Curated annotation (Swiss-Prot):
GO cellular component: cytoplasm
Cell location: Cytoplasm
Binding-site residues for [4Fe-4S] cluster 1, renumbered to this chain: 189, 192, 195, 249
Organism classification: Bacteria, Pseudomonadati, Pseudomonadota, Gammaproteobacteria, Vibrionales
Binding site for [4Fe-4S] cluster 2: 199, 215, 242, 245
Its job: Catalyzes the conversion of epoxyqueuosine (oQ) to queuosine (Q), which is a hypermodified base found in the wobble positions of tRNA(Asp), tRNA(Asn), tRNA(His) and tRNA(Tyr).
Family under the similarity heading: Belongs to the QueG family.
Protein species of origin: Vibrio cholerae serotype O1 (strain ATCC 39315 / El Tor Inaba N16961)
Pathway named in the protein's UniProt entry: tRNA modification; tRNA-queuosine biosynthesis
Protein name listed in UniProt: Epoxyqueuosine reductase
Reaction(s) the record says it catalyses: epoxyqueuosine(34) in tRNA + AH2 = queuosine(34) in tRNA + A + H2O
Domain named 4Fe-4S ferredoxin-type: residues: 177-209
Gene from which the chain derives: queG
Enzyme Commission number(s) of this protein: 1.17.99.6
Keywords: 4Fe-4S, Cytoplasm, Iron, Iron-sulfur, Metal-binding, Oxidoreductase, Queuosine biosynthesis, tRNA processing
């Protein structure tokens, strides 16, 4: 069999299935094992125990599917039209949701596309051992993507491509056929440190190393406990994930919009008013978030994140009333509500003093000099 011709055909099939780019690499990730172990030993994975539980299996694809010879790494863009980054982040009364989560959950969509790709290959070669992976499986997808030529690992630890930035999902198809491999990508970050200096919680502790325990994405999505005080103000209005390190990256000026309508903003998130989203009861949350990656954090965590955002919002009697009405429903939520109410109350002093000063000036001075 002409494996080079097959590799070319696989890449064409992938494009037809909706992927933007596909690359092929071998399964040797041994050079990444020391860094992975050091990251785990430092506790940077936080409470994501499954990462430590799988250990070095993440760097050994052949242990996930015995007989694996190659990894087909695929990329699909998710940047939605009218992303409204600046207008959303600059309005503290509106919730900011990481742009990857505005539409449908990508896991099923990308996995299904990879499965179809595997089926096409099997039809061509006969019996084929293959298995698709998307994000949640214990596999080092970013080193694989770099090795397959899809981009390099940026200082924020995400994969970057000079023509497409970083607004894309990755998926892998493990196969047991000896396809020719692609050239790995070379790092193009240079001396730029925009992502490191712009992280609101200083979570990027070294080039390419993120302490998840400090990362807003981890805190709002993976962590279900009490948010440490030191991070609450820095979270701002970010209630699900954070895009700051991508927003400041110069390479993302070239990022194209997604061709997948499933990744467009869902209608239920058109009104991102903090109070409106917080007032959703659990049934409404589950209904509005059906098919969304957001759904898996659950209603309580959704509200916890919104409480912090309301604490960070400008002084608002509406917010104070909303928070007070929901006291006593949960110890976890109460912990954050008390903090948010204190934050809101502190904000009333300065505006009131300012208003008093203005009244005195208006009444006491013959003119506004």
């Amino acid at each position: 069999m002409d494996y080079q011709q097959l590799a070319n055909q696989i890449k064409q099939w992938a494009i037809e299935l909706g992927f933007e780019k596909v690359g092929i690499c071998d399964v040797d990730l041994s050079e990444h094992e020391p860094a992975l172990q050091a990251w785990l030993d430092a506790g940077y994975h936080g409470e994501m125990d499954w990462m430590a539980r799988h250990g070095m299996m993440r760097a050994r694809p052949a242990e996930l599917l015995p007989g694996t010879l190659r990894v087909i790494s695929a990329r699909i863009n998710y940047l939605p039209p009218q992303a409204q980054f600046a207008s959303n982040l600059s309005d503290p009364n509106q919730a900011y949701i990481s742009r990857y989560a505005l539409g449908r959950d990508y896991h099923k969509l990308v996995r299904n596309q990879l499965k179809k790709l595997g089926e096409k290959i099997e039809q061509e070669v006969g019996k084929l051992g293959y298995r698709p992976f998307v994000d949640s499986a214990p596999i080092l997808e970013r080193p694989l993507a770099q090795k397959a030529g899809l981009g390099w690992t940026g200082k924020h630890s995400l994969i970057l491509d000079k023509e497409n930035g970083s607004w894309f999902f990755l998926g892998e198809l493990l196969v047991d056929i000896p396809l020719p491999v692609d050239e790995p990508s070379e790092n193009q970050c240079g001396k730029c440190t925009a992502c490191i200096t712009s992280c609101p919680t200083n979570a990027i502790v070294a080039e390419g190393v993120v302490d998840a325990r400090r990362c807003v994405s981890y805190l709002t999505i993976e962590y279900s406990g009490v948010i440490p005080l030191e991070f609450r103000r820095a979270m701002g209005n970010r209630i699900y994930g954070c895009d700051d390190c991508q927003l400041v990256c110069p390479w993302n000026r070239f990022a194209p919009l997604t061709q997948q309508s499933d990744f467009h903003r869902r209608q239920s998130l058109n009104n991102a008013d903090l109070v409106v989203l917080f007032e959703w009861d659990e049934a409404t949350f589950l209904k509005n978030m059906e098919g969304s990656a957001i759904r898996r954090i659950g209603h309580q965590q959704w509200r916890r994140n919104l409480i912090i955002a309301m604490g960070n919002a400008p002084y608002s009697p509406r917010i104070i009333d909303t928070l007070q009405r929901h006291l006593g429903q949960s110890e976890l939520l109460d912990e954050h509500i008390h903090w948010a109410l204190e934050e809101q109350t502190q904000k009333t002093a300065t505006p009131r003093q300012h208003a008093r000063l203005i009244r005195i000036i208006e009444k006491g001075l013959p003119r506004d000099a």
